[in-house]
């Protein structure tokens, strides 16, 4: 016997929730299951998903998860309680990420050639002042404080505590070699002004955090940092995933690097 599907979950107050900074937080299928004949997939996925769904409904107040963009068949969830007007149905919402196919870039110079002009301009100018930065070791408190400075309006006092735990957990994954962190300080002030954090899977590198202070952001440090990541992982992974592009400003920013849209689904019950 072999495990064909596993499903990580986080439970808070008997509710299935998606942790901050995580995408595609849902079922993972083995290669054996995914490579089976098409005529078998619907039956297999139906049987497996049904067992999970029945367990979740019985044990949790709410169900909330996301499917990876390679799993676009959501019929099993759409058919749950099909035709029963008095029964609860799954809510299925389309979401998008932005990805860059690193294997299509035969040489590194092809990476920046797909950037929007303003990004290329920012990077060119930022290189002239990048000597004012110095690499540094990561520090959880400093990273948390810098992130909160840019996103404080999103988090209540209670949520800020959870946020710090979430950032600590992601850093813990990096320290277990599931990712990498890059941090830079201003040489004059010796303060952290920029960091990025990526996590790895077998084929992809995921941009989980990309953060700078407001003054350095205006100078183009974010574009400089992303360009550095794309060059570093060119030839090492198939895909660079920006992990979500679901608001007008962030979507436009991520696609300005030549990323293509990837549809995935968020499903609730």
Model-derived features: where do they sit?
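Conserved acyl-donor/pantetheine-binding loop and adjacent beta-alpha core of acyl/acetyltransferases
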Residues: 11-26
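Aromatic (often tryptophan-rich) hydrophobic motifs at membrane interfaces
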Residues: 172, 176-269
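Conserved GNAT acetyl-CoA-binding A-motif
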Residues: 58-69, 233-243
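Long, mid-chain structured domain cores
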Residues: 45-57, 61-64, 71
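Conserved acetyl-CoA-binding loop-helix of GNAT-fold acetyltransferases
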Residues: 38-54, 217-231
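A conserved beta-strand-loop-helix scaffold within acyl/acetyltransferase catalytic domains
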Residues: 1-15, 69-217
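A short, internal acetyl-CoA/4′-phosphopantetheine-binding micro-motif in the GNAT/acyltransferase core
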Residues: 23-40, 209-218
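Alpha-helix C-terminal capping segments
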Residues: 55-59, 126, 133, 174, ...
């Amino acid at each position: 016997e072999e495990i064909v599907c596993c499903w990580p979950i986080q439970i808070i107050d008997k509710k299935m929730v998606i942790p901050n900074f995580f995408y595609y937080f849902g079922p993972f299928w083995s290669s054996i299951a995914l490579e089976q004949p098409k005529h078998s997939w619907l039956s297999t996925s139906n049987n497996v998903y049904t067992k999970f769904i029945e367990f979740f409904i019985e044990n949790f107040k709410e169900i909330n998860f996301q499917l990876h963009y390679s799993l676009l068949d959501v019929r099993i969830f759409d058919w749950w309680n099909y035709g029963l007007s008095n029964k609860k149905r799954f809510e299925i919402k389309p979401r998008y990420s932005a990805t860059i196919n690193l294997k299509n870039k035969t040489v590194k110079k092809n990476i920046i050639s797909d950037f929007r002009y303003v990004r290329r301009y920012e990077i060119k100018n930022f290189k002239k002042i990048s000597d004012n930065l110095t690499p540094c070791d990561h520090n959880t408190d400093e990273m948390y404080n810098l992130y909160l400075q840019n996103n404080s309006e999103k988090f209540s006092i209670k949520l800020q505590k959870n946020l710090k735990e979430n950032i600590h957990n992601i850093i813990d994954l990096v320290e277990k070699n599931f990712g990498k962190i890059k941090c830079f300080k201003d040489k004059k002030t010796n303060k952290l002004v920029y960091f990025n954090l990526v996590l790895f899977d077998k084929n992809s590198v995921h941009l989980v955090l990309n953060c700078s202070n407001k003054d350095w952001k205006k100078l183009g440090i974010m574009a400089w940092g992303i360009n550095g990541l794309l060059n570093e992982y060119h030839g090492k992974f198939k895909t660079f995933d920006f992990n979500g592009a679901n608001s007008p400003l962030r979507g436009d920013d991520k696609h300005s690097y030549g990323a293509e849209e990837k549809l995935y689904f968020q499903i609730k019950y």
